[in-house]
């Protein structure tokens, strides 16, 4: 496997050089000895994106204005995903959203639901709320949306995030489980945090649970998610809908006292085994896979071989200490081989969404507001990688 992967990387490098130079051939070097110019190669163009290839998607709000929606289409995305309206739904309500985007040439490939505390913590009303999720799955299938994404955690440790400086003074988002934050305004960016004033002297690792987000033990987590999955996955199978659980991000060992089983590869494997079905899948995030100290390609292999990747987040990181300290970077500036990730997706015939998320902050977005330019950069980068991989697979003979 290592030899095959090394060979692929050499071919990928040759292809990238050929495409960037507009060349039809490339010179090669073996054992530090120059060889003759290789014969001209025919590159199939345009590349074919179809039913069995990854689909670039961008995030929207279901009420977004048509100008933003059209800009997304102009920049090369044919698919979108979004936070879904609060449950419960009607078919008519969700169909109207689907039709609105369809009129702009965009298909909804995934929508995210927020699970209520009753499901996460086994509180009163759990079965009624699970019924609402089951109904939402049926409606999702009826309107033709293939994937529902969801989280299953008591608390997301945003308090460990802070902003660091990247290339050209870009704003990178960093995480440090042990970092103390005495002042929320310790830099010029709007630092994400949700600390109370009396918590500022503590590290994120020292924060305690709150009444609104009670601590959950690992045993309680597995009991609650097992109950949930056994209730909803059969409905998803019947409705031709795939469920995609997003792993813990950030993935520290504890988050305000709550266990974080979805912050480890072992936990992901255990999740997929609860109900052995392609409908019981995950959002594969090559960034999170690296944050927890795993090889993103190996994680991808494991999940793809079992047909459990139902959504994909395409981003890069630099990790100092797995699960504890890392920085999110531009996609071309981290430690993950993004070309290799995309090639493995293509070879696995992955056919759902690829979202190039978490763009670093840039000066244009800072001056104009929002983060649209950052997302367009990430989208263009990922689209270029996808087209390079598809060209390699479909027509380039290096």
Predicted regions: what is each one?
Residues 58-62, 84, 110-113, 150-152, ...:
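A cross-domain feature marking catalytic cores of carbohydrate-active enzymes
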Residues 2-53, 119-122, 138-146, 159, ...:
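Histidine-acidic metal/acid-base catalytic patches
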Residues 64-83, 143:
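Catalytic domains of carbohydrate-active enzymes, especially glycoside hydrolases
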Residues 71-78, 95-102, 276, 301-305:
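Short, surface-exposed basic-aromatic patches at helix termini and helix-loop junctions that form
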Residues 83-223, 238, 288, 346, ...:
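Structural motif corresponding to the early beta-alpha repeats
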Residues 61-72, 129-137, 295-301:
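Short, acidic/polar
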């Amino acid at each position: 496997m290592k030899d095959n992967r090394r060979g692929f990387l050499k071919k990928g490098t040759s292809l990238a050089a050929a495409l960037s130079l507009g060349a039809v051939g490339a010179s090669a070097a073996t054992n530090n000895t120059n060889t003759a110019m290789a014969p001209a190669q025919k590159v199939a163009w345009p590349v074919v994106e179809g039913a069995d290839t990854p689909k670039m998607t961008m995030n929207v709000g279901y009420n977004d204005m048509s100008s933003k929606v059209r800009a997304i289409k102009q920049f090369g995305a044919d698919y979108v995903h979004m936070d879904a309206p609060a449950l419960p739904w009607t078919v008519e309500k969700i169909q109207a959203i689907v039709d609105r985007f369809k009129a702009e040439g965009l298909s909804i490939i995934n929508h995210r639901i927020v699970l209520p505390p009753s499901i996460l913590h086994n509180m009163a009303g759990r079965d009624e709320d699970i019924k609402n999720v089951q109904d939402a799955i049926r409606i999702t299938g009826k309107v033709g949306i293939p994937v529902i994404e969801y989280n299953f955690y008591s608390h997301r440790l945003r308090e460990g995030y802070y902003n660091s400086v990247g290339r050209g003074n870009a704003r990178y988002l960093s995480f440090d489980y042990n970092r103390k934050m005495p002042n929320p305004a310790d830099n010029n960016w709007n630092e994400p945090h949700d600390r109370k004033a009396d918590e500022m002297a503590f590290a994120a690792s020292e924060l305690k649970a709150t009444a609104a987000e009670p601590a959950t033990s690992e045993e309680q987590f597995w009991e609650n998610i097992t109950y949930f999955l056994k209730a909803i996955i059969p409905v998803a199978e019947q409705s031709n809908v795939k469920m995609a659980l997003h792993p813990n991000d950030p993935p520290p060992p504890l988050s305000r006292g709550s266990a974080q089983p979805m912050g480890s590869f072992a936990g992901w494997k255990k999740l997929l085994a609860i109900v052995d079905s392609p409908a019981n899948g995950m959002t594969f995030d090559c960034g999170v896979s690296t944050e927890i100290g795993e090889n993103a390609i190996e994680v991808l292999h494991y999940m793809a071989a079992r047909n459990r990747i139902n959504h994909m987040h395409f981003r890069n990181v630099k990790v100092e200490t797995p699960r504890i300290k890392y920085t999110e970077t531009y996609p071309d500036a981290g430690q993950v081989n993004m070309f290799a990730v995309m090639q493995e997706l293509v070879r696995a015939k992955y056919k759902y969404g690829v979202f190039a998320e978490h763009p670093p902050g840039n000066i244009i977005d800072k001056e104009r507001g929002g983060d649209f330019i950052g997302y367009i950069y990430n989208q263009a980068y990922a689209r270029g990688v996808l087209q390079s991989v598809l060209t390699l697979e479909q027509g380039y003979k290096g």
